[in-house]
């Protein structure tokens, strides 16, 4: 590919770069006027199941904001339907699961994903983007076992994860069987994304902050090790791990075979660096700040970028996803500022 911008890959490898790379979680989709126009005609399901539409939405932020990576426009629920999870995305609520997991028999009933058969539209989207000469690396992704399991057990989003924790503490056989099943599914799903052309994988563990260190280490970490090792043993592709409200788990994450540790806004780059975290750090502007006046945004950007430069390996991102209310011109201005301020 002509003039490919590999800044993000070079940063992760520790090679020289011309600037700090930038991308935004949820950069594709709801904050873009072009996407909102599409949503007037098509449902979310229709957009994600039509490769041309999905590739268009994935490509938009690279063109509009000049980001250093594209992130596949999909939902972490995508691979669950093919294995027998009756999931519906409800507006204003999120994923609702009509057949929650309660027993070992429910886990045993789950099927196995065959990406070419079950999610061809995901692979077709990636291939289209590759053929379209996308000039930045494409990030594929999967949900992490805990976050997926929490939806599957609770039946949807939860504040306290009571049913999930109850299963962990009272029915280890079912819990670990579910972990194994989700690890196998995620390895198969991400492998297919990589073979289709994804160059980076991000594992989203959005809700893992609900656990303390002891429980994470015992109930979750073995599955995370298996998942990340399963990807890394087969492919020379960097893996990013991101969780929300989980700074207390940073030490545990640092010993996983990941390449990049994504931080939310609660733990600064400087603090993470001082904990001897040796991974590339990603983050971590509070997405709410994108609704603030520019001088406030700029001041926070400088602090994060200075800390990132001091750490050595840093990818600029938000501490969570872009809100629908954020103006596209703000995201473009942030990208331009990051590129200019960190010019090497």
UniProtKB/Swiss-Prot annotation:
Main localisation: cytoplasm
GO MF entries: uroporphyrinogen decarboxylase activity
Subcellular location: Cytoplasm
Pathway: Porphyrin-containing compound metabolism; protoporphyrin-IX biosynthesis; coproporphyrinogen-III from 5-aminolevulinate: step 4/4
Record carries keyword Cytoplasm: yes
GO biological processes: protoporphyrinogen IX biosynthetic process
Catalysed reactions, as listed in the record: uroporphyrinogen III + 4 H(+) = coproporphyrinogen III + 4 CO2
Listed InterPro entries: UROD/MetE-like_sf (IPR038071), Uroporphyrinogen_deCO2ase_HemE (IPR006361), Uroporphyrinogen_deCOase (IPR000257)
Domain of life from the UniProt record: Bacteria
Residues under site feature: Transition state stabilizer: 75
E.C. number: 4.1.1.37
Binding site residues for substrate: 26-30, 45, 75, 151, 206, 320
A Pfam family reported for this protein in Swiss-Prot or TrEMBL: URO-D
Enzyme class: lyase
Annotated keywords: Cytoplasm, Decarboxylase, Lyase, Porphyrin biosynthesis
Listed GO CC annotations: cytosol
Function: Catalyzes the decarboxylation of four acetate groups of uroporphyrinogen-III to yield coproporphyrinogen-III.
Family per record: Belongs to the uroporphyrinogen decarboxylase family.
PANTHER family on file: METHYLTETRAHYDROFOLATE:HOMOCYSTEINE METHYLTRANSFERASE RELATED (PTHR21091), UROPORPHYRINOGEN DECARBOXYLASE (PTHR21091:SF169)
Subunit structure: Homodimer.
Name of this protein: Uroporphyrinogen decarboxylase
Organism: Staphylococcus saprophyticus subsp. saprophyticus (strain ATCC 15305 / DSM 20229 / NCIMB 8711 / NCTC 7292 / S-41)
Gene giving rise to this polypeptide: hemE
